[in-house]
Amino acid sequence: MDSIYKKFPSNMAPGDFWRQIKRTVNGEPVSDEQISMIVSTIRDTLQLAPDDQLLDLACGNGALSQYFFDDCHSFLGVDISEILIDVAKRYFEQPNRKFVLKDVGEYIVSEPCPQRFTKVLCYGSFSYFPELTARQVLTRLNREFVNVDRVFIGNLPDLELHEAFYTDGKSHDHELKMADSLIGIWRSPSEFEALAEDCGWRCSIQRMPREFYAGHYRYDVLLARDRA
């Protein structure tokens, strides 16, 4: 699985964390208030507990991951970008809070002890997974990561709202289903619900507050198991 983040962050200063992962508005890093909104939403939704072992898929440079270190027992972040993982290791890695360089599609089938994890996070990255990878990730999380009871997938682009993002008056239909496009694959909430259910998950759609900078065209998802 290729990624726009393999080379793009090389243009950024090592400590320019939010620009490195394009958490920006008009090229400028989003405000601390916006980051706090993201962090609070993830915390509230994942319901992290002191004994949780958190897996962060496509974790980027760890700038967001670090906010959850004190909320869980252990942490593993996985990303395909050598540049971003180097930043994560340099600035954020700690004992029991580790980052590894690996393609998520490869990692999800090679993790030697998937049952150790209890919660999963994937923020702002899922739309860049090719369709087969997206389906494989969700299916493997359900079948092999058997102790994971909640998965938060954040900042998904809503197909029904793409014109709120593309305001240039041109048609962008040709790129809405391309994983390697600027935003990745756009899915309507109903499309994502169908995908999640096909992979064994119960899916809940969430919306950020109106003041969230991307709330007019993105949504979040909570995946949970049906415990018999």
Where are these regions (language model features)?
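Short catalytic micro-motifs in class I SAM-dependent methyltransferases
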Residues: G124-S125
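A conserved beta-strand element that flanks and buttresses the S-adenosyl-L-methionine
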Residues: L121
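Nucleotide donor/acceptor-binding cores
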Residues: D52, T118
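Class I S-adenosylmethionine-dependent transferase superfamily signal
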Residues: F68, L141-N142
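Class I (Rossmann-like) S-adenosyl-L-methionine-dependent methyltransferase catalytic domain
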Residues: M1-L46, P50, N61-R97, L101-E111, ...
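Conserved beta-strand/loop positions that form the S-adenosyl-L-methionine
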Residues: L57
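A short, conserved alpha-helix within the catalytic core of class I
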Residues: F129-L141
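Short glycine-rich, flexible loops that bind phosphorylated cofactors or substrates
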Residues: Y128-F129, E160
